[in-house]
């Protein structure tokens, strides 16, 4: 990367190293799909997801990035000027920034939603005990993948999408 070519690089992360992809996105979702396609039980699929995250985590660790010459700051960040970012007790000045903020699940304002055990992409992969019936809101790629995976794992799944499914 840039640090290996002599650039000064700072990585600011307020959450877990590896961000959304490693912890609550691509890695656990693909591990779950793989386990479900193999016909694993929910328990075995759960363990496969956790093991897969643990195997990849060292590649996204603070130690690895620091070993590559990247300064890692565990904090929230905000721009305080055109070329200045404040992160925790640090102030960083740079000519260029890459902003990769990740995402936050949106909980729709539905009547009764506060009365159910709600799962999001941030909690789905650690769901215990095994869900027997899921209602998936959203028929995009993630919603369809999770519908398929949990159905293969034996759960009843209902998928709801507000847009037309096919033209």
Please tell me what each predicted stretch does.
Residues 13-14, 162:
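The feature marks cytosolic C-terminal regulatory regions of anion transporters and related permeases
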Residues 29-52:
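Glycine-rich active-site loop/strand segments that organize a redox cofactor
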Residues 30-31, 37, 81, 114, ...:
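Generic secondary-structure boundary signal with a strong preference for alpha-helix termini
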Residues 1, 5, 10, 17-27, ...:
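FAD-binding core/adjacent interface of flavoenzyme oxidoreductases
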